[in-house]
Amino acid sequence: HKINSFVGLM
């Protein structure tokens, strides 16, 4: 998921 990727980046 895009959201999951975003959280991983953080």
Swiss-Prot record:
Transmembrane segments: none annotated. Its main location: secreted. The modification Methionine amide is found at M10. It is found in: Secreted. PROSITE patterns: TACHYKININ (PS00267). GO terms for cellular component: extracellular region. Keywords: Amidation, Neuropeptide, Secreted. The keyword Secreted applies. One of its GO terms (biological process) is neuropeptide signaling pathway. The keyword DNA-binding does not apply. Belongs to the tachykinin family. Tachykinins are active peptides which excite neurons, evoke behavioral responses, are potent vasodilators and secretagogues, and contract (directly or indirectly) many smooth muscles. This is Neurokinin-A. It comes from Gadus morhua (Atlantic cod).
